[in-house]
A protein has these predicted regions:
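Ubiquitin system architectures
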Residues: 1-84
């Protein structure tokens, strides 16, 4: 199991968050974990918002499919995402 450290930028809060995730994590699962983390940090739970959100990779310059996993995209340590 490979653990990655990634950064997530949430423009809604103009803040970035560091996360540790497994390389085999699906994009859907990553987005779920991100919304929980951001909700806890900002005390603004994003329940029901997940289906409205998109995750983009800054390094790859593309929107990521929820059905794929980080490993499918070749995501590594230090990759940065935007949750919009």
């Amino acid at each position: 199991i490979t653990i990655l450290l990634v950064e997530v930028y949430a423009p809604a809060y103009d803040k970035s968050y560091d996360m540790r995730v497994e390389e085999q994590t699906s994009i859907r699962q990553l987005m779920e974990e991100m919304t929980v983390l951001i909700g806890q940090k900002e005390r603004n739970y994003m329940a029901g918002e997940l289906e409205k959100l998109c995750l983009c990779s800054i390094e790859r310059g593309e929107m990521l499919s929820r059905e794929q996993c980080l490993q499918d995209y070749g995501i590594g340590n230090g990759y940065r995402f935007v949750l919009i």
